[in-house]
UniProtKB/Swiss-Prot annotation:
Homodimer. InterPro entries: HATPase_C_sf (IPR036890), Heat_shock_protein_90_CS (IPR019805), HSP90_C (IPR037196), Hsp90_fam (IPR001404), Hsp90_N (IPR020575), Ribosomal_Su5_D2-typ_SF (IPR020568). This is Chaperone protein HtpG. It is found in: Cytoplasm. The gene is htpG.
């Protein structure tokens, strides 16, 4: 019997207690996953040992045949999972099995919803799958020793999954980790060879490490019990090295769950073998749901990197651009050196070639998803659309391709849903329309009721409605699509080109000439508040509108700069008025210059509010409006 020394009882971190409660009560219906999670951890431990042994071969301790062994004892009601991977020291055990990584703790608890399906997804995402053992076990013992440490520095961790755990130092001649699950009374079904085999085949067939179970054999009466033999029950080959025709969808899905720490199936995947100048295999996945840290651009991201089937690193970020940071997967290269580092990855020209090809592969996969499964793409867009919008600024070479994947709300319907592709917009364009018209704003309600749309509604011209915070910044990088220029309908002097008839243009010129006097009066009244005053071609129903100067920053960009503490360049709007509106006609006939100025400022402030802007002096606006209301009610 192993002698235990330095025994201590420690309390679980508060979050672990909550997590254990959640595991036991919320994931009961999907209890088989405990085995998948423990096998996944054992596989990672083998990967880590292989990687560390590249520099220190002595860590193999004469045993480089890495494997996972599963056994059971019906009488004792236990299931044991053993690996000869990297193993854990006493410090590792306390850190990994007593706490959740500090960086993820707050986010994890904040993201819990009470919805079992969603929460099970989070558990995988935060790499806390070990605790799923308590779904089926009322006590768990872990025996481990880190590779390279003396046999006397083994460690025994034990817990009933309540509030505390025990840790003791033990002798452990073999490196690696052995986990013994003491099954609950109603979970004894798992102490069975066929049951364990089925779960392994279902969830872990893709694991590249051999998963072994004792061979099922019975001794003939009178004969000795045969020596225990082990048989491998999974394929034990790297899934990404196999031919696509050999791999079933279910295998791709389970492999994704393993590498993506996700409980949901992926939306799409792309598996490729590249031969020729460069040789590598890639298997790339689009997740179904956004991770909690998607908008933290510094968060760890990237693909699992293997070189000649040897695991090198997680989160190798050099293979895909930042705007595709949600993609999960594996890349296995034959051309890179086994001692490759993150620093080398950033400078290696081979990586640049692979990055170009892998980026194209992802964009092709998204195009295919959008074309063949529009409903699934709609889900993708809801989760990842805002991140994809970073693409045109980061990836000039693929700008047109990315633009084709973007989705927008538009005046085509009143749903406010971002479902319109640029290709769809152009297919519906009016005859003679050579521009793509759009309007940015704070919210869908604000832009859909904007006076800027009036002339477009009258002429039946569709306008894209852009309300994401990133949109104005995005459009500063998107100049055209399919040869058609983008036009912000709130910017500069609106020119509808062939969509305006010669009669329209002639009438506009005549009105502008006729209202020159009013233009000058308004300039005098509004003074430094405006850059220019002119007759509007945009309005049919509203009295006035504010347009942005051709080179000026729009409202969204100004707000982004202000929020980040940057200096915002000074700019003034252009005040446009509708000459046929009754208010403007009355204003034109106003004899009192003081009253003219008061009314002009009210119209200016109303136009600013309609544009979604805030007033520089709201009190002055209220005072003028109250004065006007008093006059009207007298």
């Amino acid at each position: 019997m192993t002698v235990e020394t330095q025994k201590e009882t420690l309390g679980f971190q508060t979050e672990v207690k909550q997590l254990l409660h959640l595991m036991i009560h919320s994931l009961y219906s999907n209890k088989e996953i405990f085995l998948r999670e423990l096998i996944s951890n054992a596989s990672d431990a083998a990967d880590k040992l292989r990687f560390e042994a590249l520099a220190k071969p002595e860590l193999f301790e004469g045993d480089a045949d890495l494997k996972i062994r599963l056994s059971f004892d019906k009488d004792a009601g236990t299931v044991t999972l053993e690996d000869n991977g990297i193993g854990m020291s006493r410090e590792d055990v306390i850190a990994h099995l007593g706490t959740i990584a500090k960086s993820g703790t707050a986010d994890f608890m904040k993201n819990l919803t009470g919805d079992q399906k969603k929460d099970s997804h989070l558990i995988g995402q935060f790499g806390v799958g070990f605790y799923s053992a308590f779904i089926v076990a009322d006590k768990v013992d872990v025996y481990s020793r880190r590779a390279g440490q003396p046999a006397a520095e083994g460690v025994h961790w034990s817990s009933k999954g309540e509030g505390e755990f025990e840790v003791a130092t033990i002798d452990k001649p073999q490196r690696g980790t052995r986990i013994v699950l003491h099954l609950k009374k109603d979970e004894q079904e798992f102490a069975d060879g066929w049951r364990l085999r089925n779960v392994v085949k279902k969830y872990s067939d893709h694991i590249a490490l051999p998963i072994q179970l004792p061979k099922e054999q019975a001794a003939t009466e009178g004969e000795e019990q045969p020596a225990e033999e082990w048989e491998t029950v999974n394929r034990a080959s790297a899934l990404w090295t196999r031919s696509r025709t050999e791999v079933k969808d279910e295998e791709y899905q389970e492999f994704y769950k393993h590498i993506g720490h996700d409980f949901e199936n992926p939306l799409a995947w792309s598996h490729n073998k590249v031969e020729g100048k460069l040789e590598y295999n890639s298997l790339l996945y689009v997740p179904a749901r956004a991770p909690f840290d998607l908008y933290q651009r510094e968060a760890p991201r990237g693909l699992k990197l293997y070189v000649q089937r040897v695991f090198i690193m997680d989160q190798a970020e050099s293979f895909l651009p930042l705007y595709l940071r949600f993609i999960k997967g594996v890349v296995d290269s034959n051309d890179l050196s086994l001692n490759v580092s993150r620093e080398i990855l950033q400078k290696d020209p081979i990586i640049d070639s692979m990055k170009t090809a892998l980026t194209k592969r992802v964009l092709d996969m998204l195009e295919k998803l959008a074309k063949n499964e529009p409903e699934k793409y709609k889900g993708f867009w809801k989760n990842f659309g805002q991140v994809l919008k970073e693409g045109p600024a980061e990836d000039f070479a693929n700008k047109e391709k990315i633009a084709g994947l973007l989705r927008f709300a538009s005046t085509q319907d009143d749903s406010g849903e971002q479902s319109v592709a640029l290709a769809d917009y152009l297919a519906r364009a009016k005859e003679g329309q050579d521009k793509i018209y759009y309007l940015t704003g704070e919210s869908y309600a604000q832009v859909k009721n904007s006076p800027h749309l009036e002339v477009f509604r009258k002429k039946g011209i569709e306008v894209l409605l852009l309300t994401d915070r990133i949109d104005e910044w995005l459009m500063s990088y998107l100049n055209e699509f399919d040869g058609k220029a983008f036009v912000d309908i709130a910017r500069g002097d609106l020119d509808l080109g062939k969509l305006d008839s010669e009669e329209d243009k002639k009438a506009q010129e005549e009105v502008a000439k006729d209202k020159e006097g009013l233009v000058e009066r308004l300039k005098g009244a509004l003074g430094d508040s405006v850059a220019e005053v002119r007759v509007s071609h945009r309005l049919t129903d509203s009295p006035a509108i504010l347009a942005i100067g051709e080179q000026d920053l729009g409202l969204q960009m100004r707000q982004i700069l202000e929020a980040s503490g940057q200096k915002v360049p000074e700019s003034k709007p252009i005040f446009e008025f509708n000459p046929s509106h009754p208010l403007i006609e009355k204003l034109d006939h106003e004899q009192s210059e003081d009253r003219f100025a008061e009314l002009s400022h009210i119209l200016f402030d109303q136009a600013a509010l309609a544009a979604g802007d805030s007033l520089k002096d709201p009190a002055a606006y209220v005072r003028r409006l109250n004065k006007l209301l008093v006059e009207l009610s007298a």
